[in-house]
Amino acid sequence: KEYRRQRQMCIRDSNMVDGIDGLLGGLSSVSFAATGIILWFDGQYSLAMWCFAMIAAILPYILLNLGALGRRYKVFMGDAGSTMIGFTIIWILLETTQGKTHPISPVTALWIIAIPLMDMVAIMYRRLRKGMSPFSPDRQHIHHLIMRAGFTSRQAFVLITLAAALLALVGVVAEYTRIVPEWVMLILFLLAFFLYGYCIKRAWKVARMVKRIRRRIRRHSGNNPN
C-alpha cells in the first residue's frame, strides 16, 4: 500500500508540474539523467539504458515544443504522457532504492526529483490549509512565481530546469562519493524544502523583490554601457 501511495503521488506530481512548454520534459530528463548516471556507475546497465532511452524519447518533444528547430509546434504531453513519465520515474526509483543492496539511497531519490516533489507538496499543503481540494488548479506553482517576477515562459523553463539539475547533481555527487552521511543529506533536503515553501508562501513578495532587483540591474547596465 505504501508503494502504491508513493507511485500515485509521483504520477500526480508529474501531471501538476506540466504547466508551461517543455517543463515536464526538462524536469523528467534531469531525473532520468541523474538516475541513469548513478545506475551506470553501479553496473546496473539495463536500468541505466532504460533511463537514457526515456531521455532520447523526451528530447524531440522538448525541441519541438520550444521551437528549437526554428519553428514552434503545438506538441502536447497530455495526461497520458505525463502520468506515464511519472510512473516510470517512480518505478525505477522504487526498484533501485529498496532491498539490502540498493544502488541508490532513498534520500538521493529525493534530490533527484526535488523540484517536482517540493512543488507538489507545498502547493497541496497550501490548498488544504485553505480548505480547498489538493488537486484544484491555481496559479501558485513555481513557474507561475517566476513568470510573475517578469520572466518569460522560456526563461522560467531554463531557470527551473537548471535548479532541478543542480539539486539532482547534489544527490548524484553525494551518492557517488558517500562522504556525507544520509541523515545529513536528509536534513539538507528538508532545509531546501523549507526555503522553497517559504518562497511559495510569500510568492507575491518574492516576485516584487525579484522585479526590483531586475530593474536595478537594467538601470545599472544602462548607466554603464561600457
Task: Go through the PLM ranges and name each one.
Residues L23-A149, S153-G222:
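Alpha-helical transmembrane segments
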Residues M16-L24:
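RNA/tRNA-interacting regions in translation and RNA-turnover enzymes
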Residues K1-R7, I11:
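Single conserved hydrophobic/aromatic residue that forms the stacking wall/gate
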Residues D13-M16, L145:
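Residue-level recognition of specific faces of alpha-helices
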Residues E2, N224-P225:
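N-terminal cationic leader/targeting segments used for protein routing and processing
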